[in-house]
Each structure stands twice: as structure tokens, then as C-alpha cells.
Design a protein with these regions (language model features):
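FabD-like malonyl-/acyl-CoA
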Residues: 47, 113-117, 335-339
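Gly/Ser-rich oxyanion-binding loop with an adjacent helix/lid
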Residues: 1-7, 11-18, 22-25, 63-64, ...
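A structural signal for short, well-ordered beta-strand segments
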Residues: 97-99, 195-197, 336
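Short Gly/aromatic-enriched secondary-structure transition segments
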Residues: 23-30, 211-212
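Glycine-rich phosphate-binding loop
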Residues: 332
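N-terminal cofactor/phosphate-binding cores enriched in small/glycine residues
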Residues: 18, 30-31
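C-terminal nucleotide
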Residues: 1-11, 15, 36, 40-71, ...
């Protein structure tokens, strides 16, 4: 019996929150941590799922009976991938799949997309099915949207399947065009620090869907297919509803920030706001950090998806010397990403832990986010 081992990474989003489903720009990078799927083919048309993180009885699914809503809980994500592959015309066969993960669940680092993509690659390989990765990302997104019921965009699956080591990936969510830009913070003595606030988020809850509906209404009123297609910030003034105005302003400015950071990271590219040569890496990370902090304020005040622990973490990190910080993921819980110099790293961690405990909150957990390769076969 052939056993295959497939790994798909989580992701951190350097810039562009809630811009993906608005057809704007996003700038994620893959993490070293992710989900591993150890899989063997079955001849009985069943998918049998086990997870080390959910050590209950195995979840057994008949491929022929899969339909949206037929599987719930964590198993809905891999089941949804099998359903979406078959619905897209790919005759994947049954498999026994053991899942393991070193990603925190509900921390805004796309554990669900990593689960989907590792299983999708395993099912395709065991079934002798070839799917281009760009298309597989869309299939995994369909699984999350239609089978699981989370109205997410394309960023998470694209990051899991298409990222490169030592790069961030600028994705135009309108055209799905990708530009890989160098992102090597360690070479500049900088750490991309993920702060898990220990407040779990769930994107199937109503607030995420409400934000998406508000964006769609704002786009309709502005006469465009999606807010990400608007480049003139003054266009938001045409929106009479102050809530819709704020939502649109966030999408337009965050998409612009994603492009600005991507341009800044390109080798030898001068850019507005910095010296012409800009080989001072500290100067570059101060520039990027400033944009991260601007993005957090936009997510907090205009898009209203932040939460108290994230706001405190961002403020404390910056006060302790971080270049900048922002919440990442869909919001309402999850993590903060901070750019911190190596010499300030221990102090930032210590101050954040002390600040959380003093407020009666669980101590945050930390993860050094190293830009890593996309999903791949391990064995």
C-alpha cells in the first residue's frame, strides 16, 4: 500500500485584509508551520479522516453522498475539498488520511486552508489526477465557501499553494496575477513576529458575512463590480452612509498599502517616502512598519473587525520599539503581526506577556514567521 505525505503551510498576511473578496491586492507569505496529511488510497469510495488535534473516532465519509452541509466540524474542510474536486469534474477516489498540524487553530494564520490544500494534493496524487495549482486554489476556495459556508476570498489557498521561500506574494485578486517579491527580514536583523492573542475567531460567524455584504453594497452604489477596482480614495465621499464610506475607505487604502509594500520590497526599487537608493534596510522596515500600523488603525476604526487584545498588543509592541504591527486574518479574534528588530525581540515578548497578564487575559503565544515554500510532498 502506497502512503504519501503532503504538507501545506499556514500564512501570514503582510498587508491586505478583507481586500481579497473585494478584488483588491493582498500580500501574504507562507509560514514554516502548517498541516501534514498522511494518506493511503482506498478502493471502497470512502474517505476516512483522523486528526491528532481531534482524537475522537475517525470521521468516515462516502464520496457518493457528499453534499454541502453533510459534514460538520473540522472534517468539513477536507470533505469539502473532495466534494469540490468531484463537482469540478475530477474523479478523486477514496483515501485514509491522517491529519497533523503545528498551526494554532483560530489564530488567523489560515489553518483551514492549509488543511484543505494538503488534503487536496493528497487526493489528487493518489487518484492520478493532475490539477494546476492556480485552479486547485479556486477549488479549495469553493470548498470553504459552498461546503463549509465561510464566505472567504482566495488569499489563503493561493498562499498555501503558490508561495515561495524568502518571498511575499502580491496577488491581484481581480485577475489572480501574482508577483513574487523578495521578503527576507532576517537578513536585516528583523523578525516577523506573530502574536497569538488566544482569542479564537470563526469566519462562519455573521460579522464576516456582514462586512462582505456591506462592501458589495458600497461597490454597487459606486457603480463598480468590486471595491478593489476603485483607486481614487475620494470616490468614497459619494457614499452617503457613513458605515459604507468607512468600509470602502479601508478596502481602497489597504489594497494600496499592499502594492506600496510590494514595490518597496523589490530589489533596488526606489519608492516614495524613502531615499532614492533605499539600501538602508532599517529605513525600509520603518516604512513598512508604518504602513502596518496604519492598516491596523483602518481595520480597527473603518472596518471594525479588531478586538481588544489585538489593539493592546499592537500598542504595546509599538511602544516597546516594534517597527509596526497589525492584526492579521479576518478579525474578531486571532493574531497580530509585528515587525521587530532582533535586539528588541525579547523585550517585546516580555512586555506583551506582562501586559496581557496584568489585564487578566491569557498570556499570548509567539511564533516567528519565516517566509517559507508552498505546499509540497514530503514522502
Amino acid at each position: 500500500m502506497t502512503v504519501e505525505v503532503w504538507f501545506a503551510p499556514g500564512r501570514a498576511n503582510l498587508m491586505g485584509e478583507h481586500t481579497d473578496y473585494n478584488e483588491g491586492y493582498v500580500l501574504p507569505f507562507a509560514l514554516a508551520q502548517g498541516v501534514t496529511a498522511t494518506a493511503a488510497a482506498r478502493a471502497d469510495g470512502l474517505v476516512v479522516l483522523r486528526s491528532k488535534q481531534a482524537p475522537d473516532e475517525p470521521v468516515t465519509i462516502s464520496l457518493d453522498s457528499l453534499a454541502p452541509g453533510s459534514v460538520t466540524g473540522w472534517a468539513a474542510y477536507p470533505a469539502g475539498v473532495a466534494w469540490a474536486l468531484r463537482a469540478s469534474g475530477y474523479a478523486v477516489r477514496g483515501a485514509s488520511i491522517d491529519i497533523d498540524s503545528d498551526l494554532p487553530v483560530g489564530a488567523g494564520v489560515s489553518s483551514s486552508a492549509a488543511l484543505e490544500c494538503s488534503v487536496a494534493l493528497a487526493l489528487c496524487s493518489l487518484s492520478g489526477v493532475s490539477v494546476e495549482r492556480e485552479k486547485l486554489a479556486l477549488i479549495a476556495k469553493r470548498a470553504e465557501n459552498e461546503f463549509v459556508g465561510a464566505p472567504t476570498g482566495i488569499i489563503d489557498q493561493s498562499a498555501a499553494l503558490l508561495s515561495r521561500a524568502d518571498h511575499a506574494m502580491l496577488l491581484d485578486c481581480a485577475t489572480l496575477a501574482i508577483t513574487q517579491v523578495p521578503f527576507r527580514p532576517s537578513e536585516a536583523g528583523v523578525v516577523a513576529l506573530i502574536v497569538d492573542t488566544r482569542v479564537t475567531h470563526a469566519l462562519v460567524s455573521g460579522e464576516y458575512a456582514a462586512r462582505r455584504a456591506e462592501c458589495e453594497e458600497a461597490a454597487r452604489l459606486l457603480g463598480v463590480a468590486a471595491l478593489g477596482l476603485v483607486t481614487d480614495i475620494h470616490a468614497v465621499e459619494r457614499l452617503a452612509d457613513p458605515v459604507l464610506r468607512r468600509r470602502a475607505r479601508h478596502v481602497i487604502t489597504d489594497s494600496a498599502r499592499a502594492r506600496a509594500i510590494a514595490y518597496a520590497l523589490q530589489d533596488d526599487a526606489p519608492y516614495e517616502g524613502l531615499s532614492e537608493t533605499r539600501r538602508d534596510e532599517g529605513e525600509m522596515y520603518r516604512f513598512i512598519g508604518k504602513l502596518l500600523t496604519e492598516a491596523h488603525l483602518s481595520l480597527r476604526d473603518d472596518f471594525e473587525v479588531s478586538w481588544p487584545e489585538a489593539d493592546v498588543a499592537v500598542d504595546a509592541a509599538i511602544e516597546t520599539g516594534a517597527y509596526g504591527a497589525k492584526m492579521i486574518g479576518g478579525g474578531f479574534g486571532g493574531s497580530v503581526l509585528a515587525l521587530v528588530s532582533l535586539e528588541r525581540l525579547a523585550t517585546v515578548r516580555s512586555v506583551l506577556t506582562k501586559t496581557f497578564i496584568e489585564r487578566g487575559w491569557a498570556a499570548p503565544e509567539f511564533l516567528d514567521a519565516v517566509p517559507s515554500p508552498a505546499a509540497r510532498r514530503l514522502a
